[in-house]
Amino acid sequence: MTASPYIAVVGGVGRNIAHNLALLGAKVKLITALGADDGAKRIEASCADLGIDLSDSLYVPDGATSTYLFLADSNGDMALAMNDMAIYEHLTPTFLETKLTTLNAAALVVLDTNLSAESIRYLGEHCTAPLFADPVSAAKAGKLEPILGRLHTLKPNRMEAELLSGVTVTDEASLYRAADTLLAAGLQRVFISLGADGVLAADHERKIHLHNLPARMVNTTGCGDAFMAAVARAFLDGADLETAAKRGLAASAIAMESADTINPAMSLTAVAERIQ
């Protein structure tokens, strides 16, 4: 019997980061928008299994839980994608204001740009917890520009870094200039994902270009989410820049080896072993 080419998994950038953080031993609360449908039930069940707290999420009875469809090529890379994320428009500044006490009590808050520009700006202006941001895509990265100075950590890819810094990256020198520009905007740390060329990690004391770790490539979708989760967990552990970047690369390598967006083998132990 031929295996089905279609695989349906629980996903979403923010949820994937939350899932990986839970596997890495962090206590996680996920604030998202859910419909009254099978997609929401699957997310609820997945989060319950992982101990992820959904109690502050918004339920939209007539809304459809967000969906994301992608087609992978023979190398496991995304060839085509489409999505329906209209439900996230319900995560308004007014709604987020009701969650501000919870957000400000967190050790860190991770946001992605599936939120509206207005909601992202609200978080930047009112959330006092360290903010980590994933630009998600070049099309959505611009939403972060007004709050760059209020972010602690940013994880863009090369194209997103170019857009947010205004620096065209053509070589190592221009890559470093892009990082400097982003740090000058107020960031504490930036991790610029370079695909097959690894990552440039930078803070106000140093910059380091690290190469990818060996991995058996099965599926690259979810690697960036795993990287962000590991970097966030490293922050919680008080890790320095290089250690955080190495953990991110290790988590990304582990994620790459699973057909699912999340590798169930993800753990702090697995990350540490991959680095050695």
Model-derived features: where do they sit?
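Acidic active-site catalytic centers that drive phospho-/nucleotidyl reactions
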Residues: 16, 134, 160, 219, ...
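Aromatic/hydrophobic pocket-lining residues that form π-stacking "cages" and hydrophobic walls in ligand
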Residues: 17, 43, 120-123, 251
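Ribokinase/PfkB-type carbohydrate-kinase core domain
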Residues: 45-59, 70-206, 267-270
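Conserved phosphate-binding/catalytic region of the ribokinase-like
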Residues: 140-141, 145, 172-276
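Glycine-rich phosphate/adenosyl-contacting loop at the front of the ribokinase-like
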Residues: 1-33, 38-49, 211, 216-217
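Short, conserved phosphate/pyrophosphate- and ester-handling motifs at nucleotide-, phospho-/glycolipid
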Residues: 21, 157, 224
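Short, glycine-/polar-rich solvent-exposed loops and beta-turns at beta-strand/coil boundaries
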Residues: 61-63
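Short alpha-helix plus adjacent loop in nuclease-associated cores
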Residues: 65-68
